[in-house]
Amino acid sequence: MIKAGIIGGAGYTAGELIRLLINHPETEIVFINSTSNAGNKITDVHEGLYGECDLTFTDELPLEDIDVLFFCTAHGDTKKFMESHNIPEELKIIDLSMDYRIASPDHDFIYGLPELNRRATCTAKHVANPGCFATCIQLGLLPLAKHLMLNEDVMVNAITGSTGAGVKPGATSHFSWRNNNMSVYKAFEHQHVPEIKQSLKQLQNSFDAEIDFIPYRGDFPRGIFATLVVKTKVALEEIVRMYEEYYAKDSFVHIVDKNIDLKQVVNTNKCLIHLEKHGDKLLIISCIDNLLKGASGQAVHNMNLMFNLEETVGLRLKPSAF
């Protein structure tokens, strides 16, 4: 059994990670660290786990007793922890924050998008889990970058559910504001754009165009629905073939002939992609669950690869479409 520890156990991504790990046939949770909830039952915070989890939060860190450590911490906290603690040499780490997503000679974290870096992830000791928007958008663009087709600015509009803002309530996450409402935030300035560009440049070294990304807050709890527009004269049939070939060995990305809906992916680790051609404009529609494929599900996917398990173990999930 893979023995796992979690640091930062009170948020939405941690709750989903706990749910996935307690139902994973090859994993045992050894500890869930939360300084603000130490001594409390997990179900005091994650009430959806009643009857499934009898663990309590702890402020202890028995790192020698685990094989893999997940960070579900605020941005900046993982880096502080890594710099201030003695990490066992063989301990594998999966960081769900943005601290190590950008490659640097100062760290050895692999960018953990399996559909891009599968081979490197399989042998990695430290993995940086991608951002939710970044995952959804990259999966819509990677095949084009592979074929050196991203030579002009890419227009992206994407809407996310309220869980993307985290568990702490804020002015834009209260039900009375969010319900029946929609708004733009961080237009052209979202923090996930650098990691998107990094990945595209990895496949297409000549890529120097802009990702003109406009994020929206939606009035639903979870999921990301993105539309991307790229100019190309290549026929739709050829583009579909490129996408199907690129994702042929990836279990969680599916190219769909019919138009797609967000509810087809909510509560799953899937990404669905639909392609349309309108004149010289290619419309790419990509959707994921922000908490699963965009966070905790992808973290478990990375764990499976790091421990040489079949990638879908513990991730065969039914969408909550009805």
From Swiss-Prot:
It comes from the Bacteria. GO terms for biological process: L-arginine biosynthetic process. It catalyses: N-acetyl-L-glutamate 5-semialdehyde + phosphate + NADP(+) = N-acetyl-L-glutamyl 5-phosphate + NADPH + H(+). Disulfide bonds: none annotated. The active site is at 132. Pathway: Amino-acid biosynthesis; L-arginine biosynthesis; N(2)-acetyl-L-ornithine from L-glutamate: step 3/4. Its main location: cytoplasm. GO terms for molecular function: N-acetyl-gamma-glutamyl-phosphate reductase activity; NAD binding; NADP+ binding. It is an enzyme of class 1 (oxidoreductase). Its EC number is 1.2.1.38. Keywords: Amino-acid biosynthesis, Arginine biosynthesis, Cytoplasm, NADP, Oxidoreductase. The keyword Cytoplasm applies. The keyword NADP applies. Gene3D superfamilies: Dihydrodipicolinate Reductase, domain 2, NAD(P)-binding Rossmann-like Domain. It is found in: Cytoplasm. GO terms for cellular component: cytoplasm. Belongs to the NAGSA dehydrogenase family. Type 1 subfamily. Catalyzes the NADPH-dependent reduction of N-acetyl-5-glutamyl phosphate to yield N-acetyl-L-glutamate 5-semialdehyde. This is N-acetyl-gamma-glutamyl-phosphate reductase.
